[in-house]
Design a protein with these regions (language model features):
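Arginine-glycine-biased low-complexity disordered regions
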Residues: 5, 133-140, 201-207, 218-224, ...
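Walker B catalytic acidic pair
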Residues: 87, 111-113, 215, 282-283
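Conserved SF1/SF2 helicase motif Ia
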Residues: 7-16, 27-52, 63-67, 134-139, ...
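Post-DEXD/H (motif II) to motif III coupling segment of the RecA-like Helicase ATP-binding lobe
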Residues: 100-172, 333
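Conserved ATPase-coupling elements of RecA-like P-loop NTPase cores
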Residues: 22, 52-53, 92-98, 112-129, ...
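Conserved two-lobed SF2 helicase motor
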Residues: 79-94, 250-269
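Conserved interdomain hinge at the start of the Helicase C-terminal
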Residues: 128-130, 178-228
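Conserved nucleic-acid-binding Ia/Ib motif block in the N-terminal RecA-like helicase ATPase lobe
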Residues: 34-96, 104-107, 224, 231-236
Length: 362
């Protein structure tokens, strides 16, 4: 990140320290004696904005660097050298509302860059930022960070920046060796619910689990069905929950007051909680193709199971399968990442393995 500052595409495994890499780089590159905003970090979700701001503050605690955040219900009263926000807020707060502040910007980080570029709304905001830099002849270093970059994403980046430094991994290097990947055959969607119910019957109160579901509708249905069975579960959604409720849910989950969290992909990327030892894919993630068909969402799969096995700890990812296309998609994921997803032997073995992981970490 020294002069001359090249733009960088950096790929690294989930849980390997990407935040530390760009966080330390950002903090060491800004002038702490200047009150101008010099670096902006773009995150996909509110939860990640809050999480990353906190981590950057820890890294900067022995400096005069001030980290600020912009949220839908929170704008800073004072400015700092580094701002964390979503791409949409970069456009609305930075490019439109406070355009005079952008002249001192020298670094822009896109965390989970592949999803920011793929998403129509966030990519539009980022493209407007790039256009502004070009129009104003600004020399802004762009850092693209993610565990996953497909060919189309890399092409989009190179269309804007012909000269970027690439740090890439082979696909087979991306699969997470600290995460035991399993699948469980269920005879129906109701059988998937029964599996989770059986797990909750015998799990201890200290074991936290994230359950990923593909649609908001089924997030709500799964919560309702499990609650009727007497299970205490909580949900996390994006725009369908108020910011205050989202913040409180994450706070309680981190503290261990909530053990079971059902969510959509809003929590699939970047969320960091070492105590999560089990991730369950109620649905395998899929992405709609141009012809209307569905293919496995390989990137989302890797990011979902990457919510466990963080920073050298051990974890388990269980994929629940019932329809024939579930097994086809599972095989495609195995082939794509050149990995093996084993059939789960028994609930008892799963619990024994989880218990061992918790013991090893304590």
């Amino acid at each position: 990140m020294k002069e001359p500052r090249l733009s960088v595409v950096a790929q690294a495994k989930n849980g390997s320290g990407k935040t530390g890499a760009f966080g330390l780089g950002v903090n060491s590159s800004v002038d702490e004696n200047s009150k101008n905003i010099q670096a902006a970090i773009l995150e996909l979700t509110r939860e990640l904005v809050i999480q990353i701001k906190g981590l950057l503050e820890q890294m900067a605690k022995h400096t005069k660097i001030k980290i600020i955040q912009v949220l839908v219900d929170e704008e800073p009263n004072d400015y700092g050298q580094v701002v964390v926000m979503t791409p949409v807020h970069f456009e609305t707060w930075f490019l439109k509302k406070n355009k005079n502040l952008i002249k001192n910007l020298k670094m822009l980080v896109l965390d989970e860059a592949d999803e920011i570029i793929k998403n129509e709304t966030t990519s539009r905001s980022v493209n407007r930022a790039f256009a502004t830099f070009k129009k104003e002849k600004m020399n802004v270093q762009i850092l693209f960070f993610s565990a996953t970059f497909d060919n189309q994403c890399l092409k989009s980046i190179k269309d804007f920046y012909k000269y970027v430094y690439m740090i890439e991994l082979k696909k087979e290097e991306l699969t997470l060796e600290n995460v035991t990947q399993l699948y469980q055959e269920c005879n129906s969607p109701e059988g998937k619910i029964d599996f989770i119910d059986n797990y909750l019957k015998i799990s201890t109160g200290s074991q936290r689990v994230i359950i990923f579901v593909n649609t908001i509708k089924y997030v709500l249905k799964l919560k309702e069905t499990l609650e009727k069975k007497g299970r205490k579960v909580y949900i996390l959604m994006g725009k369908d929950m108020s910011p205050a409720n989202r913040d409180e849910t994450i706070r309680r989950f981190r503290k261990g007051e909530i053990q079971v969290l059902i969510t959509s992909n809003v929590l699939a990327r970047g969320y960091d909680e070492r105590s999560v030892k089990l991730v369950i894919n109620f649905d395998l993630p899929v992405r709609k193709q141009n012809d209307g068909s569905y293919e496995p969402d390989y990137e989302s799969y890797l990011h979902r199971i990457g919510r466990t096995g963080r920073f050298g700890t051990k974890g388990i990812g269980v994929n629940l399968c019932c329809a024939s296309y579930d097994f086809v998609n599972l095989q495609k994921i195995e082939h794509f990442y050149k990995t093996k997803i084993e059939k789960m032997k028994s609930m008892e073995e799963l619990m024994d393995q989880l218990k061992k992981f918790y013991t090893d970490d304590n």
